[in-house]
Regions:
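An N-terminal assembly and electron-transfer interface module characteristic of large anaerobic redox
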Residues: 1-256
Length: 256
């Protein structure tokens, strides 16, 4: 179910509240999953819709919940997650960020997780990252890199991060596993995006379209040829000899 893909991914982002809108079953299991996964430190809230909401819309209820969460929890952003029933009846929460912009001063993201259009959690993960580009700012000067798609702890221990730090390459954001909303808003000043998981490809493509930031896709599979070619591209773009650091033979690649 894409709902759980969103919970898996978006809950990494610091001080961002998730508001799940759906039946009591959807909201309960989403909250329960997040609560146990994060040992009670999650920021997942529920708006359980009733029969009257199906008939007359739950939009007012969702807006009220958002305002209450902002008042009591002071999050840096809110992600509204629409599930199957709201999608079936045609509820459209995508306009919430515009209708609330005069009342709240934080980003309000909206992610649709209708299970009847897909049969996996991966689309939810991808959508929850892709929507983040809507909060990014425009910058003239480009510097450093972003890591997109890393969703485990201890990113500092990865080979990629160690190499970047060794050569004093600025790391603007690691999305989603180690970032704040401010990091996300400033991620568009990067010179390059390094994608380490396919769930972040849609985000990388969106950033390419909006901000003309190129990306390199490493993938998570251990393929030496792919790794070597990607480090060769990195060396070309960032003007650093990563291949020598790794003891890899130089290869000829075409950089876009």
């Amino acid at each position: 179910c894409p709902l759980f893909g969103v919970i898996l991914t978006a809950s990494y982002i610091k001080n961002m509240a998730l508001v799940v809108v759906g039946t009591s079953e959807c909201t309960y299991y989403a909250k329960n999953f997040a609560y146990h996964r994060q040992e009670g430190l999650d920021s997942v809230y529920s708006v359980a819709i009733k029969e009257s909401d199906v008939v007359f819309s739950a939009e007012k209820k969702v807006k009220k919940a958002i305002k209450q969460i902002i008042e009591f929890e002071n999050p840096d952003a809110i992600m509204v997650v629409s599930t199957c029933v709201p999608e079936v009846i045609g509820e459209d929460y995508s306009s919430l960020s515009y209708s609330l912009e005069d009342e709240v001063d934080i980003p309000v993201f909206v992610v649709n997780t209708d299970h009847f259009t897909c049969n996996a959690h991966i689309p939810g993960m991808s959508r929850s990252l892709a929507v983040l580009s809507t909060a990014m700012k425009k910058f003239k000067d480009k510097k450093g890199i972003n890591i997109l798609g890393h969703r485990q702890k201890n990113v500092e221990e990865t080979e990629l991060i160690k190499l970047m730090k060794k050569h004093n390459i600025t790391i603007n954001a690691v999305i989603p596993s180690k970032c704040s909303i401010e990091d996300i808003q400033n991620a568009s000043k990067a010179q390059l995006n390094i994608v380490t998981d396919m769930i972040a490809l849609d985000l990388a493509k969106s950033m390419k379209k909006k901000f003309d930031i190129d990306y390199i896709y490493f993938d998570k599979h251990m393929d030496k040829e792919t790794i070597t070619k990607n480090y060769a591209k990195l060396s070309e773009i960032l003007e650093v000899d990563f291949l020598s650091d790794l003891g890899l033979e130089p290869v000829f690649v075409q950089v876009r």
